Amino acid sequence: MRTLTLLSAFLLVALQAWAEPLQARADEMPAQKQPPADDQDVVIYFSGDDSSSLQVPGSTKGLICHCRVLYCLFGEHLGGTSFIHGERYPICCY
C-alpha cells in the first residue's frame, strides 16, 4: 500500500514538472495581432488562360476554393494566388 502511495506521489510530481514548462511557453507567446478594421483588402489572382472555366457561368458550380497558409491539402489543386496584408498565399480548390 505504501508503494502505491509513493508511486502515485512520484507520478503527480512528474506530471506537474512536465506541465510547468508548457504553461511558461504559453504565457510567453505574444497575442496574435489583429488587423485594423479598415485594412481588409484581399487581392486574388487566378491562374489559367483567358478561356478558363472561371468565366463561363455555371461551370464553377460546386467548385470550392480556400486561401491556404502554406500549401494545398490532398485532393486540392492550385487555383491561384491571394495576397493578404502583403503576404502571398495559395488558393486551393476542390
UniProtKB/Swiss-Prot annotation:
One of its GO terms (cellular component) is extracellular space. Disulfide bonds join C65-C93, C72-C92. The keyword Secreted applies. Its main location: secreted. Residues 1-19 form the signal peptide. Has antimicrobial activity. Belongs to the alpha-defensin family. This is Defensin-7.
